[in-house]
């Protein structure tokens, strides 16, 4: 909501500066409490950065380009997730503090670029800054419409993704005796597929099929992944199944964000904030449930996540049929 009032650029700028300060503190930390304060500061200053960034992409995109641009944003994040630990590990070989100082430098360069180069998207897209009071009735109307359905689907998708990711490392070790290297290869394949599909295919596919059908296919694939994991027999089959997992994530996440952006009109910031809250809530609950179920049976989390994904598929199918 704050980014709807004062603009996306200030929120993103503050967030990047927060990353810089937090990483510097991490590099200089000599006690647990310094680390704790640095992490808390990072969360306080940068928690809205991803939300404002998604809103910025929504502001700056036409409806036809929105899914493609959301996909490219997701691909860029996947590249960072894949390369960050790699370079961090290399730099840590020289000094444990060096990865943090390097990250702080990169974050500060990004901060300077945002301040000096990045235009304010709300002004560019013609949306006025919202200085007036919060319109609860307008928000309620949106949440009872398509935006509410999309938020439910975002929760379900994040819930299933987090649940599957959280227990798969244990599952493949307990069932097949995977080495840490084999587990790493699985996640490298997932990251690679995410980058390629989000970066090059999600947008064009959405333009051809429509957002609802693409989301429907993606969530159904998530259910197939969960059930198929119970039937896997070794390394190759796990790679294939989690390749499909990456495809389903690449199709659903950016398309859901793009659909929410379309439904938001001038309130992209607050709805993206709700989406972030739904996603974060699912990431708290899903690992707890998956871990509890895993203690009962190692296949039970997959069956449960598959059933939840099927519920999401049904919700999406009804949404597709009833909302034009």
Residue ranges of model-derived segments:
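Helix-to-loop junctions at the C-terminal end of transmembrane segments
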Residues: 1-7, 197-210, 294
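Conserved MFS/SLC helix-loop-helix module at the cytosolic interface between two early adjacent transmembrane helices
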Residues: 1-30
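Paired small-residue
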Residues: 22, 33-41, 236-244
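Cytoplasmic helix-loop-helix junction between adjacent transmembrane helices
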Residues: 38-78
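Helix-loop-helix hairpin linking two adjacent transmembrane segments in secondary transporters
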Residues: 73-115
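Juxtamembrane intracellular "pre-TM" segments in multi-pass secondary transporters
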Residues: 119-151
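Short amphipathic helix-loop junctions that connect adjacent transmembrane helices
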Residues: 167-182
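C-terminal transmembrane helical hairpin of 12-TM major facilitator-type secondary transporters
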Residues: 212-256
């Amino acid at each position: 909501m704050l980014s709807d009032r004062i603009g996306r650029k200030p929120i993103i700028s503050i967030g990047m500066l927060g990353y810089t300060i937090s990483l510097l503190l991490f590099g200089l930390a000599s006690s647990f409490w310094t680390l704790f304060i640095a992490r808390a500061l990072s969360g306080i200053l940068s928690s809205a950065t991803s939300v404002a960034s998604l809103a910025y992409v929504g502001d700056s995109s036409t409806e036809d380009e929105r899914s493609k641009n959301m996909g490219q944003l997701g691909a860029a994040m996947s590249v960072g997730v894949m390369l960050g630990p790699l370079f961090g590990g290399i730099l840590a070989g020289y000094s444990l503090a060096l990865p943090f100082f390097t990250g702080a430098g990169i974050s500060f360069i990004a901060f300077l670029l945002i301040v000096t180069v990045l235009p304010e998207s709300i002004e560019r897209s013609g949306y006025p800054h919202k200085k007036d009071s919060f319109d609860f009735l307008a928000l309620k109307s949106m949440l009872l419409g398509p935006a509410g359905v999309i938020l439910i689907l975002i929760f379900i998708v994040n819930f299933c993704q987090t649940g599957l990711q959280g227990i798969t490392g244990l599952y493949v070790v307990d069932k097949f005796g995977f080495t840490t290297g084999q587990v790493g290869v699985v996640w490298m394949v997932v990251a690679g597929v995410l980058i390629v599909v989000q970066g090059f295919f999600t947008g064009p596919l959405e333009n051809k099929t429509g957002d609802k059908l693409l989301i429907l296919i993606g969530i159904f694939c998530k259910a197939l992944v969960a059930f198929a994991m119970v039937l896997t027999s070794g390394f190759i089959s796990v790679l294939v199944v989690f390749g499909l997992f990456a495809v389903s994530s690449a199709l659903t996440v950016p398309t859901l964000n793009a659909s929410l952006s379309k439904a938001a009109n001038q309130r992209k910031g607050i709805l993206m904030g709700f989406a972030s809250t739904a996603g974060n809530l699912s990431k708290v609950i899903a690992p707890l449930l998956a871990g509890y179920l895993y203690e009962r049976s190692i296949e039970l989390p997959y069956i449960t996540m598959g059933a939840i994904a099927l519920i999401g598929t049904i919700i999406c199918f009804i949404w597709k049929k009833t909302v034009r």
